[in-house]
């Protein structure tokens, strides 16, 4: 999970992030982070390349906080996007 703060329009940056193949979902949020996104990487090297090499290079990205899942206790998906 990535918590991203931005200096410019979060909607524009979220759209750009959503184009990355590793990104599962992107949401605009209220609170400390402007954007939250879940990413799927093969290993820590892949995650490092994604965060440092691509996401932090997007114009307007201020900070990226990475939280890795240690254990998934529950995941339910029953709603649609329409």
Q: Which functions belong to the PLM regions below?
A:
Residues 1-82:
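A compositional/biophysical signature of low hydrophobicity enriched in polar/charged and small residues
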